[in-house]
Amino acid sequence: KETMEEQIESDIVTRKLWANPDWYDVDQLREFFTELHERAFVPGGGMRQFGAAMRTPSRVEGLQALDIPTLVVHGENDTLLSIEHGRRTAELIPGAELLEIEGMSHDFVYQV
């Protein structure tokens, strides 16, 4: 998007695709994204981040090599990355614990 205002509105619309409908609050999201972009607005940054994520090689070896206490938190209703992704991540990290949050989607919201 060309302007910060356009990006904020786009972020609000996009968030609706994978947000928990019970916790989707346009005013709260507008405030959140405004604060976020006032700190660091980078036109096109979201698309570059998405492209980088899609081109990243497997993280399996890196996860298996972790040697720190780890809690994987994942929403059971995540439509962007299914709960299986969270389970697999916890399975790959030695000694990791998994916290599956009932009713939560991909967004980590204040209500949780």
Model-derived segments and their meaning:
Residues 14, 81, 108:
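Hydrophobic/aromatic residue at the end of a short beta strand that borders the catalytic acidic motif
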Residues 66, 72-74, 78:
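Short beta-strand/loop motif that positions the catalytic acidic residue
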Residues 1-61, 68, 88:
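Alpha/beta-hydrolase
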